Amino acid sequence: MKTYLEIKVPIYYSAPWFSELRKALKDMPVLWQKGYYHITLAFVDDTQHLPDVEAIMHKYLDHAHPVNITFDKLDVFTAGNGMKIVHLGTNNIPKGLQTLVDDIRHDISCTNSNIQSDFKLHVTLGRISEPETNIEDVGFLIDEIDFMPFTLTLNEVEYRVFRGRSIYKSTLK
């Protein structure tokens, strides 16, 4: 069973910087995400021993604190499947968040579950699936945007079946 742990990011499709990004990439074949913005902390491709994994969520997240992140960049990268991901990111991952993610991912891997990829802090804003789209062209257009950094407090986490039911939810306090 595929599962994932995410932390929700309260941004809006209507935000001025997001509108400017969509306008800059209007001639690119981007499929924009129109809601449900989050950072995936762990994508577990083959979840073994679900009760053990759920216990890990309680161990680390029941008493975790909210995280402040300053988002200071818009960028694009190529995912393992070849899709280009237009995203919001940061140059400074908070140490506490990185430690939390590392600890959770380590403990999940000890359950013989297969974590699909390394942690790369980003919020997916759009996807380009056409392989002929040049990533450098997309990056150049993104670089032209006058993007002002902003800080958000993230406090809502959810562990769920991929495209399915929620297994664990917590509001960090």
Residues of each region from the PLM?
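Histidine-dependent nucleotide/RNA phosphoesterase domain, centered on the 2H-phosphoesterase fold
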Residues: 1-173
